[in-house]
Amino acid sequence: MFSRDLTLARFDADLFAAMQQEAKRQEDHIELIASENYTSPAVMEAQGSVLTNKYAEGYPGKRYYGGCEYVDVVEQLAIDRAKELFGADYANVQPHAGSQANAAVYLALLSAGDTILGMSLAHGGHLTHGASVSSSGKLYNAVQYGINDQGLIDYDEVERLAVEHKPKMIVAGFSAYSQKLDFARFREIADKVGAYLFVDMAHVAGLVAAGVYPNPVPFADVVTTTTHKTLRGPRGGLILAKKNEEIEKKLNSAVFPGAQGGPLEHVIAAKAVCFKEALQPEFKAYQQQVVKNAQAMAEVFIQRGFDVVSGGTQNHLFLLSLIKQDITGKDADAALGRAHITVNKNSVPNDPRSPFVTSGLRIGTPAVTTRGFGEAECRELAGWICDILDNMGDESVIDAVRGKVEAVCAKFPVYGN
């Protein structure tokens, strides 16, 4: 029998100490990684619940194990809320991650060797959209589209590639693109060549849920997303679709038993919580502020002489090119890290440097907006970053900025009382 008095702090002091240090880092550092956010205590409570003890292979009402009557309720709540949130007829909440959701879509609708047309990783796409190092680029014949000199997707070029290569699936989605996608145009191109349209909205799902970014569900054959990032839930995946019994059956079979075994019901419970949070009126205000904050930061960088890819942003992120300044993304990332500002180095279009070094930074505002930052704080923050980038190697500038970061973090705690 377990004793509730045997806490983690008492049983495993080393692990607990590391966790406490990470909690302190999150409070004391400004988080600008576009794919990161902070979950609510309710999400974490669900994820740390007794649901972690239950095996539940199958789907609600059709399990391979007994004793699933309550996890069925949990999973059905998540399904129903996801469908309501995104206006979908179908939802599968079992994928353990966004990459696994994408793999399940490919498994459901493609055969090995089929052609897919997706956005190039070097131009802002994702590994799972056909990058050569990913299974999506190894199992399928991946053709890639990119962005033009203005940093925008050239839809005529996408159409030309689709007509030339006749893909079975067109993938729309990104990990580093700051403008809105034209889902109607993608649908038109897909229909012209008889391809499935698959949208990966992992980065913008929260914006979509709040109605501040176009919803791909009415246009796509299938949509995937992560449940963290802008959606602010647990780390996990989600598949959505319009009503199509044939596709629904294929997707369910591809997730289980095709790609996964037992679902993580404690994570699914946390997804249900985050979907309920996203259905609240204040979530829309939060997402609107996320975009305003990103736009405010981008404006400051442009005013200070830095190049923002595509000239600005219509979502939660933007790419900062440092080619003109001859600064590597790796060095900029490290310098900002010493000031307790966390970003990630990122390749920019036509980057002359390797992906391990890069010539740019990806900056996103979901996490700082969760803390309570508004446009004023974000403009000030962008100015601090510019000060460091304009004085690379000057540790006194980094020290001064770190002091300002500590003060603003104390003013805007992640988890208040």
From Swiss-Prot:
Binding site for (6S)-5,6,7,8-tetrahydrofolate: L121, G125, H126, L127, S354, P355, F356
Record-marked site positions (Plays an important role in substrate specificity): H228
EC class name: transferase
Xref: InterPro entries: PyrdxlP-dep_Trfase, PyrdxlP-dep_Trfase_major, PyrdxlP-dep_Trfase_small, Ser_HO-MeTrfase, Ser_HO-MeTrfase-like, Ser_HO-MeTrfase_PLP_BS, SHMT-like_dom
Listed GO MF terms: glycine hydroxymethyltransferase activity; pyridoxal phosphate binding
Gene Ontology BP, a term: tetrahydrofolate interconversion
Location of this chain's protein in the cell: Cytoplasm
Top-rank taxon: Bacteria
Catalytic reaction annotation: (6R)-5,10-methylene-5,6,7,8-tetrahydrofolate + glycine + H2O = (6S)-5,6,7,8-tetrahydrofolate + L-serine
Gene Ontology cellular-component annotations: cytosol
Cofactor: pyridoxal 5'-phosphate
Gene3D superfamilies: Aspartate Aminotransferase, domain 1 (3.90.1150.10), Type I PLP-dependent aspartate aminotransferase-like (Major domain) (3.40.640.10)
Keyword annotations: Amino-acid biosynthesis, Cytoplasm, One-carbon metabolism, Pyridoxal phosphate, Transferase
N6-(pyridoxal phosphate)lysine sites (modified residues): K229
Pathway: One-carbon metabolism; tetrahydrofolate interconversion; Amino-acid biosynthesis; glycine biosynthesis; glycine from L-serine: step 1/1
UniProt xrefs under CDD domains: SHMT (cd00378)
EC number: 2.1.2.1
Cross-referenced PANTHER family: SERINE HYDROXYMETHYLTRANSFERASE (PTHR11680:SF50)
Record's subunit section: Homodimer.
Family of the protein in this entry: Belongs to the SHMT family.
Function: Catalyzes the reversible interconversion of serine and glycine with tetrahydrofolate (THF) serving as the one-carbon carrier. This reaction serves as the major source of one-carbon groups required for the biosynthesis of purines, thymidylate, methionine, and other important biomolecules. Also exhibits THF-independent aldolase activity toward beta-hydroxyamino acids, producing glycine and aldehydes, via a retro-aldol mechanism.
Descriptive protein name: Serine hydroxymethyltransferase
